[in-house]
Amino acid sequence: MEIFIANKRLGEPYSDYVGRGHPLGNPFSHLSKKSHGAKYRKTRELAIFAYREWLTFQIENKNNIVVNALKDLRMRAKGGEVIKLGCFCHPKPCHAEVIREFILDERISFGEQNVK
C-alpha cells in the first residue's frame, strides 16, 4: 500500500484532504490563534499525541463516520490506488502520519476490534 502526505498550502497534489472539516481532521491544535475551534495543546507533538488517543477511542467505540473514512482509505490503498493525504503541516510532524500508520497497520481492525 502506498500512502503519502502532501502539503495543501504548498499546492502539492493530494487525493484526500484530512484536515479540519473532514471526519479524520485533528480536533486538537498547538496554534492558539488559528485553531478554528480545535482544542488547544501546548505543542505540535502534544496535539498529535492527543489525536492518536482520540482516533484510537473513535475506532474502539465504533464511530461509524471515522471508521468508514479509514476503511475507505485502506480499501483504496489495498486496491492499488496511491493515496495522498492532504494537510497543512507536512513536512512537519502531522496527524496525517497517524492516519497513515493506522491504515498501514493491518493489526488494527476498523470497527471490529482494535489491537493498538
Regions found by a protein language model. Name each.
Residues 1-116:
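Catalytic phosphate/metal-binding cores of nucleic-acid and nucleotide-processing enzymes, i.e., regions
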